[in-house]
């Protein structure tokens, strides 16, 4: 039986940085680049993940498959001086490596971020999806609705180059 877990982490244990970079590298190559079109040099990716852990407005969640980091998601809180957006956080860098998909990690990561956002008092959780990920908006909506046990009563739609983008 496959062991699937999600946890909030504040430090990277031995091997975690390597696993996180490997999973992110695989996800970027598969088109889920959360800002990268091609994987950056390993040193850059390592610095990125180390940096995430020291930014107070970022909370990192990792998904593990049999103890190996296979995906992540972050809750990003607004800057303290952003009074107008103080009610809204962002779910970002959400990915699962291709080799770890279909085990429920995306759903569990989404639930963890959503629960943390709600516990922190946020009323809005934003999710941005890249235009090249045309199937992602409906997939993300299904994962979110499934994760929180909700039906989507209404959404705001914008058209960007001929396809719908969803803001929840």
UniProtKB/Swiss-Prot annotation:
* One family name in Pfam for this protein: Acetyltransf_1
N-acetyltransferase domain ranges (all copies): 7-168
Enzyme class per UniProt: transferase
The protein's name in its UniProt record: Uncharacterized N-acetyltransferase in hisH-hisA intergenic region
* SUPFAM superfamilies hit by this protein: Acyl-CoA N-acyltransferases (Nat)
The molecular function terms of the Gene Ontology recorded here are:
acyltransferase activity, transferring groups other than amino-acyl groups
Against PROSITE patterns, the record matches this protein to: GNAT (PS51186)
- What is the species listed in this Swiss-Prot or TrEMBL entry? Azospirillum brasilense
Q: Which Gene3D superfamilies match?
A: 3.40.630.30
Name the Enzyme Commission number(s) assigned to this protein.
Answer: 2.3.1.-
Alphabetically sorted, this entry's keywords are: Acyltransferase, Transferase
Keyword Thylakoid part of the UniProt annotation: no
């Amino acid at each position: 039986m496959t062991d699937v877990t999600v946890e909030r982490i504040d430090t990277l244990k031995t091997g975690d940085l390597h696993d996180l970079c490997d999973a992110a590298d695989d996800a970027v190559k598969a088109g889920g680049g959360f800002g990268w079109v091609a994987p950056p040099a390993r040193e850059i990716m390592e610095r990125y993940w180390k940096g995430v852990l020291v930014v107070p407005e970022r909370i990192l969640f990792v998904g593990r498959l049999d103890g190996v980091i296979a995906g992540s998601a972050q809750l990003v809180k607004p800057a303290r001086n952003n009074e107008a957006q103080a009610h809204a956080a962002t779910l970002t860098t959400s990915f699962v490596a291709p080799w770890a998909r279909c085990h429920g990690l995306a759903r569990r990561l989404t639930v963890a971020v959503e629960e943390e956002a709600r516990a922190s008092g946020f009323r809005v959780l934003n999710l941005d999806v890249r235009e090249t990920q045309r199937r992602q908006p409906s997939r993300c909506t299904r994962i979110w609705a499934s994760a929180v046990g909700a039906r989507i009563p209404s959404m705001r739609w914008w058209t960007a180059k001929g396809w719908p983008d969803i803001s929840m």
